[in-house]
Every structure is written in structure tokens, then in C-alpha cells.
């Protein structure tokens, strides 16, 4: 069976983090959860996580990627797994109408030549998977570790560096000849390497950052993308499974 590691990172405990703890963690013999607190003073014993959940407390160095990197590379934990889901504390969900596990959406997206998959793709600059939640297979992760996109020796220091890293990991994937993908139906079947059809030839079919309220129920809905950025868009709790 495929072994999956879910890495969730936060730096401040708030309602979104509490929601993830209560609604997004479940027991499965093939899925492990690692919760990473980018807060050296955080006390996990106060939040009563299930005993099967792994936890890590660290200094807030390197932002989300710093936390994910330490989770992956400390004791080479990533070597035990086949596929990986990364999430940060801006996410809110999951929005699912049936009994499908939310992790399945991100793992099942890693098929054919797609090595990096998320809820949404932003086509500003280089087309890139937005990293509030995304998945990688082991081959792609190993490559990104090799070229330093996940590192515990060179940390991202600024918001600009973090934004650039989000863009560049997608570029690294497509430059390698692999594809990226997301849950947005309007992007199904698109080859984001643009080898056979140039990006400009898609015209207005490729959008920039659409994870905003004004695009909700116009270009996407929460059940299509499973998780939204809760720091931008507010929804009623009754919509969440």
C-alpha cells in the first residue's frame, strides 16, 4: 500500500488550527499526520491530539517551508513514505459532500505525469500550484530536496522569498518535464509544461490568483477545491463536513 505523510504547519494557534485538529485528522494505517508548530513555546499537551499524531515544536525559522523541511528531513522521515501532502494554517475545510477522505483528492491527483498537485494554480508569472495545500510524490520531493527547495541549512527569510519559492518549485517540476495539476475543473487536461501549446495560446482561460471571494461561485466553489484560504474567505461552518 502507498504510505502517505501529511505535514501541517502553523505558527500561531487560532480557530483555523483548532478546526484542522478537530475535523481534518483521522486514523488510517497508511496515512500519518505530522503537526509542526513554528513556535518554540507551544504546548501540544494542551490541545489533546490523538496519540497516533506526530508533533514537532521548533523556532519560527524559514516560514512554512522551514517547518515542512525540518519535518521531512529530521531523521530522514520522508524516506518512509511514498506520497506527501503539505498544508499551512490558512486552509479551511474540507468541503466534501460524500464520505471521500479529503486526502484522497490530493493523492489521486498525482497520476500520469503530474508530480505536484494542489487545490488551485495561479498563472501569474510562471504557472504554479499555490502552496497553502499541495501534494508531491516521492520522486518529485527527492528532486526538490536535492536542489535545495526543501532544506534545513538554507532557510527562507522574507515573504518575498517564500512567494518566490512557491513559484519556483512548480517551475522546477515543469522544467524537469513533469506536469503540475489542481482541482479546478477548468484546468483539467492542461499540460503546464506548455511544450505543445504555448501559454499565450490559452488566452483568458488561464487565470491569476482566484482564491478570493469575488471569484467564488463564478470560477470555483468550495466543493470543487475542497479547501479554501480561510484567511481571505469566510464561510459558515455548516458548509464544512
Regions found by a protein language model. Name each.
Residues 1-241:
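ER/Golgi luminal nucleotide-sugar-dependent glycosyltransferases, focusing on the catalytic module
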Amino acid at each position: 500500500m502507498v504510505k502517505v505523510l501529511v505535514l501541517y504547519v502553523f505558527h500561531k494557534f487560532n480557530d483555523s488550527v483548532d478546526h484542522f485538529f478537530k475535523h481534518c485528522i483521522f486514523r488510517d494505517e497508511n496515512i500519518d499526520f505530522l503537526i509542526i508548530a513554528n513556535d518554540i513555546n507551544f504546548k501540544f499537551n494542551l490541545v489533546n491530539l490523538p496519540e497516533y499524531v506526530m508533533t514537532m515544536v521548533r523556532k519560527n525559522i524559514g516560514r512554512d517551508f522551514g517547518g515542512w523541511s525540518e519535518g521531512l528531513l529530521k531523521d530522514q522521515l520522508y524516506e518512509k513514505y511514498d506520497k506527501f501532502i503539505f498544508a499551512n494554517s490558512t486552509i479551511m475545510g474540507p468541503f466534501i459532500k460524500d464520505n471521500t477522505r479529503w486526502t484522497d483528492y490530493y493523492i489521486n491527483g498525482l497520476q500520469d505525469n503530474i508530480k505536484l498537485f494542489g487545490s488551485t494554480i495561479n498563472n501569474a508569472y510562471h504557472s504554479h500550484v499555490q502552496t497553502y495545500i499541495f501534494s508531491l510524490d516521492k520522486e518529485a520531493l527527492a528532486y526538490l530536496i536535492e536542489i535545495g527547495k526543501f532544506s534545513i541549512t538554507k532557510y527562507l527569510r522574507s515573504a518575498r522569498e517564500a512567494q518566490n519559492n512557491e513559484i519556483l518549485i512548480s517551475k522546477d517540476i515543469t522544467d524537469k518535464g513533469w506536469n503540475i495539476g489542481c482541482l479546478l475543473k477548468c484546468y483539467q487536461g492542461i499540460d503546464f509544461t506548455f511544450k505543445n501549446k504555448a501559454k499565450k495560446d490559452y488566452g483568458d482561460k488561464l487565470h491569476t490568483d482566484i482564491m478570493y471571494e469575488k471569484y467564488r461561485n463564478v470560477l470555483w466553489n468550495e466543493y470543487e477545491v475542497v479547501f479554501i484560504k480561510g484567511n481571505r474567505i469566510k464561510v459558515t461552518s455548516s458548509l464544512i463536513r
